[in-house]
Amino acid sequence: RAISYRHTNNIHFSQVKMSVTIQKMVRSDIGSAGVAFSIDPETGYNKSIVINSAYGLGELVVSGGVKPDEIVVNKRTLDNKNCDPILSKKIGDKKTKIVYDKSGTIELETSKDEENTYSLSDDQYVYLANVIDKLEKAYQELFDSPIGIDTEWALDGLDNKIYIIQARPETIHSNNETLEV
């Protein structure tokens, strides 16, 4: 259907700004998941990375159905071993999470321990921020533009690895002129 649409509308394949990845099923239902922005999604500030995370599948974070943990990381200090790049951390209440069951998925209450514990370690937040920073640079090179990116990610509870589920250009602030501070 997509190929037919592009052909009918004379859209060359190089104009399509989407990629598709086939990967293993990530077991974030027994890990955590969330979103990350390479610019502040509220202000457009482009020197920080904002990560939202919660336990279970990422659906509740993406839809706003849960108050996630929020971590802000300074891009300028990501490579500086003498400086902590984490600017701020706010723990979310994370009252519920979505997990797999026999018939699909179900929403469960999180444990008190999960509510009061960040859903990633500081090292994992910094690792994820580094990945987001590299993805942003790749997108900027690809589009020859200073765009930010919006990503969805998941931590597999079995192998303890972070996977990027989706990455796309950020659409609210990236179209505006970027201000240097």
PLM regions with names:
Residues 1-181:
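Conserved mixed alpha/beta core segments that line enzyme active sites in large multi-domain catalysts
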